[in-house]
């Protein structure tokens, strides 16, 4: 049974957050595979937000376009690329994956001074550089062309 969000729903001051990984739900639902930075690479790329709907409605499972949880990541699947490693300002991404604690320290501790600047809204600043100017930014990257192919039209290969 599908229930709609009530008209009188009040969003708490601290926002809404799920107690599960939206990226993992999207992966299990067949929407993409994981990258070296732990982001989900979909047909529209890695630079996105995920959300899910909890329901008891019956759906027919869709076929998966991939067989490995890291198939769309050029570094994990063929040892090429690694652009997200280069893009990370705090060294939280390396050949072995994403150091979530190092990333968290950068986002929530090192950047706290940014929140005091005029016009800043919120209590922390996200980073997301590992999801921009990379071959998987806006699509599933083409194999064997990780460095030669810019992530977005108009960017140089090593921007």
Ranges and model annotations:
Residues 1-158:
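Catalytic cores of enzyme domains
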């Amino acid at each position: 049974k599908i229930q709609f969000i009530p008209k009188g729903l009040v969003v708490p001051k601290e926002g809404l957050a799920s107690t599960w990984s939206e990226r993992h739900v999207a992966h299990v639902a067949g929407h993409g595979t994981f990258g070296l930075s732990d982001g989900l690479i979909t047909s529209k790329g890695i630079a996105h937000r995920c959300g899910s709907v909890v329901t008891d409605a019956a759906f027919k499972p869709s076929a998966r376009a991939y067989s490995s949880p890291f198939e769309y990541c050029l570094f994990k699947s063929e040892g090429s690329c690694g652009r997200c490693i280069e893009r990370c300002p705090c060294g939280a991404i390396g050949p072995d994956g994403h150091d979530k604690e190092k990333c968290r320290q950068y986002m929530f501790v090192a950047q706290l001074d940014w929140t005091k600047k005029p016009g800043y809204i919120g209590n922390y600043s996200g980073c997301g550089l590992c999801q921009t100017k990379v071959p998987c930014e806006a699509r599933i990257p083409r194999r064997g062309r990780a460095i030669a192919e810019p992530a977005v039209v108009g960017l140089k290969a090593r921007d």
